[in-house]
């Protein structure tokens, strides 16, 4: 696969120079200008330039809406087909009949799948922020199921309210009936859907790099530009980060499917580079996406599930609480809120009638709730900053084009 598109390598290197009035600009000055432009864009954030950031965000939103409107206008047949299908689904949903029991069941499953796939996409794409939805949503969900399973001696939680709320079933389970596999099976759907979402979120770097390689155009994406610079200076790379990126690139390029599978299965921050590498070397789509899907939705998710389940198993949690209490001086005061939190969770699991009543709030749960709110707020702010910087990049590209034509 490394041979695909190799005739374009020298042409790609030649495109790093700009021709102006019959002469070529020094590549070092071009790189310096790109660096200054990048630093200028990075300063466009809400806490430094709030008015400009909000203005650019609004303008970028209008530009994106205009682009999507234009794309949809040129695909009128697809839009009409979509609305006809939507109208048929709405009619099926609201018309009374014997089919409603199946509609409700499909709706429940669809919303469950869409929720976790959406969180997986957000975790993978992140829009420049890396919103770690595993730490905020899936991890706590697996931990809650694990704690409840050991407390109830069962994973047959009543539905509803599960998965929105976990309470013990009326029939008591036998002591020691819970196994690692039973908890893994209970959270398999949520975890696999989340993993599928993360695999889908890895597609944009692949498509961007593939389109840039096939078209031969100068790419706008900074990560792709850094990737090309890394290939040009591969022999002189000295720092650890560059060597790690080169190792990932060589693994994917030479091993192919199993190299991509290895990168997707092992938690690492460099998988975006694998997507760019596969797109750049024109790896077939199903080779890339198939390996990514298997690695992220099956292998990696089982590794993460087992880690969370083992960490929050009953005896491990009890040992951690006891260890906290053994800290000299401050141990008992630190141990108390953890004990209160665990006791409150047990009460919620065993008292069905009190599940909806207000209970005293523990500072641990209060802290976690505020952490989630802060992460979501930061994610929203980062979207605003990212879109504002995208509009600033449009302005810089327009100015650079005008300079070249003078």
From Swiss-Prot:
<feature type="topological domain" description="Cytoplasmic">
    <location>
        <begin position="2"/>
        <end position="77"/>
    </location>
</feature>
<comment type="function">
    <text>Phospholipid scramblase involved in lipid homeostasis and membrane dynamics processes. Has phospholipid scramblase activity toward cholesterol and phosphatidylserine, as well as phosphatidylethanolamine and phosphatidylcholine. Required for autophagosome formation: participates in early stages of autophagosome biogenesis at the endoplasmic reticulum (ER) membrane by reequilibrating the leaflets of the ER as lipids are extracted by ATG2 (ATG2A or ATG2B) to mediate autophagosome assembly. Regulates ATP2A2 activity to control ER-isolation membrane contacts for autophagosome formation.</text>
</comment>
<protein>
    <recommendedName>
        <fullName>Vacuole membrane protein 1</fullName>
    </recommendedName>
</protein>
<feature type="topological domain" description="Extracellular">
    <location>
        <begin position="327"/>
        <end position="363"/>
    </location>
</feature>
<dbReference type="GO" id="GO:0016240">
    <property type="term" value="P:autophagosome membrane docking"/>
</dbReference>
<dbReference type="GO" id="GO:0042953">
    <property type="term" value="P:lipoprotein transport"/>
</dbReference>
<keyword id="KW-1003">Cell membrane</keyword>
<dbReference type="GO" id="GO:0034329">
    <property type="term" value="P:cell junction assembly"/>
</dbReference>
<feature type="topological domain" description="Cytoplasmic">
    <location>
        <begin position="385"/>
        <end position="406"/>
    </location>
</feature>
<feature type="region of interest" description="Disordered">
    <location>
        <begin position="1"/>
        <end position="37"/>
    </location>
</feature>
<dbReference type="GO" id="GO:0098609">
    <property type="term" value="P:cell-cell adhesion"/>
</dbReference>
<dbReference type="GO" id="GO:0000421">
    <property type="term" value="C:autophagosome membrane"/>
</dbReference>
<keyword id="KW-0813">Transport</keyword>
<comment type="similarity">
    <text>Belongs to the VMP1 family.</text>
</comment>
<comment type="subunit">
    <text>Interacts with BECN1. Interacts with TJP1. Interacts with TP53INP2. Interacts with TMEM41B. Interacts with ATP2A2, PLN and SLN; competes with PLN and SLN to prevent them from forming an inhibitory complex with ATP2A2. Interacts with ATG2A.</text>
</comment>
<dbReference type="GO" id="GO:1990456">
    <property type="term" value="P:mitochondrion-endoplasmic reticulum membrane tethering"/>
</dbReference>
<dbReference type="GO" id="GO:1901896">
    <property type="term" value="P:positive regulation of ATPase-coupled calcium transmembrane transporter activity"/>
</dbReference>
<keyword id="KW-0926">Vacuole</keyword>
<feature type="region of interest" description="VTT domain">
    <location>
        <begin position="173"/>
        <end position="316"/>
    </location>
</feature>
<feature type="transmembrane region" description="Helical">
    <location>
        <begin position="306"/>
        <end position="326"/>
    </location>
</feature>
<dbReference type="GO" id="GO:0000045">
    <property type="term" value="P:autophagosome assembly"/>
</dbReference>
<feature type="compositionally biased region" description="Polar residues">
    <location>
        <begin position="21"/>
        <end position="30"/>
    </location>
</feature>
<dbReference type="GO" id="GO:0005886">
    <property type="term" value="C:plasma membrane"/>
</dbReference>
<dbReference type="GO" id="GO:0005789">
    <property type="term" value="C:endoplasmic reticulum membrane"/>
</dbReference>
<keyword id="KW-0472">Membrane</keyword>
<keyword id="KW-0072">Autophagy</keyword>
<dbReference type="GO" id="GO:0000407">
    <property type="term" value="C:phagophore assembly site"/>
</dbReference>
<feature type="topological domain" description="Extracellular">
    <location>
        <begin position="272"/>
        <end position="273"/>
    </location>
</feature>
<keyword id="KW-1133">Transmembrane helix</keyword>
<dbReference type="GO" id="GO:0012505">
    <property type="term" value="C:endomembrane system"/>
</dbReference>
<dbReference type="GO" id="GO:0017128">
    <property type="term" value="F:phospholipid scramblase activity"/>
</dbReference>
<keyword id="KW-0445">Lipid transport</keyword>
<feature type="topological domain" description="Cytoplasmic">
    <location>
        <begin position="131"/>
        <end position="250"/>
    </location>
</feature>
<feature type="compositionally biased region" description="Basic and acidic residues">
    <location>
        <begin position="9"/>
        <end position="20"/>
    </location>
</feature>
<feature type="transmembrane region" description="Helical">
    <location>
        <begin position="251"/>
        <end position="271"/>
    </location>
</feature>
<feature type="transmembrane region" description="Helical">
    <location>
        <begin position="110"/>
        <end position="130"/>
    </location>
</feature>
<dbReference type="GO" id="GO:0005783">
    <property type="term" value="C:endoplasmic reticulum"/>
</dbReference>
<dbReference type="GO" id="GO:0007030">
    <property type="term" value="P:Golgi organization"/>
</dbReference>
<feature type="region of interest" description="Required for interaction with BECN1">
    <location>
        <begin position="378"/>
        <end position="406"/>
    </location>
</feature>
<dbReference type="GO" id="GO:0140056">
    <property type="term" value="P:organelle localization by membrane tethering"/>
</dbReference>
<dbReference type="GO" id="GO:0033116">
    <property type="term" value="C:endoplasmic reticulum-Golgi intermediate compartment membrane"/>
</dbReference>
<feature type="transmembrane region" description="Helical">
    <location>
        <begin position="364"/>
        <end position="384"/>
    </location>
</feature>
